[in-house]
Structures are given as C-alpha cells and as structure tokens.
Amino acid sequence: MSQVKLNLIAAACDNMGIGVNGALPWRLKKEMAYFTTMTSKVSEPTKVNAVIMGRRTWDCIPDKYRPLQDRVNIVLTHNVDSVKENVPEGVMVFPGLDEAIKYIEGREDIESTWVIGGSSIYRAAMTHPNCGKIYLTEIQKSFDCDTFFPNIDKQQFHLVDEEQIPGEKQVEGNISYYFRVYKKL
C-alpha cells in the first residue's frame, strides 16, 4: 500500500454543514489561521505539503488566495482537460484520489497531504485505505448550509488527543468551537 497518508481538515457546524452558496457560512479568523498553519506547517524546510480539493472547492477560494500559498495545490475533477486550461501553472489536476496519490508518491518534497473538500472528496478520502486522520473543527452553533461533511463512523474513527492541538473551547465573537482529531482505526 502507498505510504501517502491522507489528513482531512474541515470546519463543520452543529448540523455538519461546511458551506452555503459556495462560501463558508461563518467568518472565524483564528479558525482560518489554524487551517492555514495545519496545511502549511512542515518539519523540514526543504519540504512542502499538498492540499487536495474538488473543483467546486477550488472555485470557492477567492482569486486572491488561489492557489493556496506554500502548498502544492491538487484539484480533482471529471473534466481534467477543461480545468487544466483554467488553473495557474503549478496547480495539478487529476480525475481522482488514486491519481493524486500516485503523483504525490513520485515527489520526494511532499511531507503531508491534506484533503480540504468538498463533500464528495471528503467521502472518498474517508473510505480510502490511505485515510489517516480527520482534523475537524466542531462549531457549536447551527448555520444554514447546502454542503455537508460526511457522517463520521465512530466504529472506524476514534477521537484522539494530539499534543499540538488545543483541546479547550475556542471562542470568536459569539461562536464557540473545538478542534477535534479523529484517527482511523
């Protein structure tokens, strides 16, 4: 089996919503900084991380933030050729997770791989044999959403503590949330 471990990272509200109308339903600066740090941080300065996302997630990232800096951006889509024409040089486009993993295996400079959405990409990653952990920010409030994080099967994923992840409640404005880590058994 491939050595590439998939880490999923998402923020979801009480109803497991992760998006509405192509945007995040909340504005949480500290939570967004956590996402950036987690998906960018490397232990060796010669390495970078990869972020894997679906085409709709790519489209939802504001132009000024695309591609996500200091990370190898990988977009998954059924329309590889048309998407390749519309992304900046250096952004990789593949038809599926297995092709992306094969590409990552061929690069010695990639330290960690992060799956950043959307729903169908999360679902595929959670059931993939290379799935390692889910880093889920659990927002303690409901929002209207049209996009949802897949249900986490507690028989397959167990809540774990990680030293560098704060376990205490986080608060921004009138929204509280927890950083959680689920490890695939």
UniProtKB/Swiss-Prot annotation:
It is an enzyme of class 1 (oxidoreductase). CDD domains: DHFR (cd00209). It comes from the Eukaryota. Substrate binds at residues 31-36, 71. The keyword NADP applies. The keyword Cell inner membrane does not apply. SUPFAM superfamilies: Dihydrofolate reductase-like. InterPro entries: DHFR, DHFR-like_dom_sf, DHFR_CS, DHFR_dom. Keywords: NADP, One-carbon metabolism, Oxidoreductase. GO terms for cellular component: mitochondrion. Activated by dithiothreitol and p-chloromercuribenzoate. Inhibited by trimethoprim, methotrexate, sodium tetrathionate and hydroxymercuribenzoate. Pathway: Cofactor biosynthesis; tetrahydrofolate biosynthesis; 5,6,7,8-tetrahydrofolate from 7,8-dihydrofolate: step 1/1. PROSITE patterns: DHFR_1 (PS00075), DHFR_2 (PS51330). GO terms for biological process: dihydrofolate metabolic process; folic acid metabolic process; one-carbon metabolic process; tetrahydrofolate biosynthetic process. GO terms for molecular function: dihydrofolate reductase activity; NADP binding. Residues 5-184 form the DHFR domain. It catalyses: (6S)-5,6,7,8-tetrahydrofolate + NADP(+) = 7,8-dihydrofolate + NADPH + H(+). NADP(+) binds at residues 11, 17-23, 55-57, 77-79, 117-124. Key enzyme in folate metabolism. Catalyzes an essential reaction for de novo glycine and purine synthesis, and for DNA precursor synthesis. Belongs to the dihydrofolate reductase family. This is Dihydrofolate reductase. It comes from Heliothis virescens. The gene is DHFR.
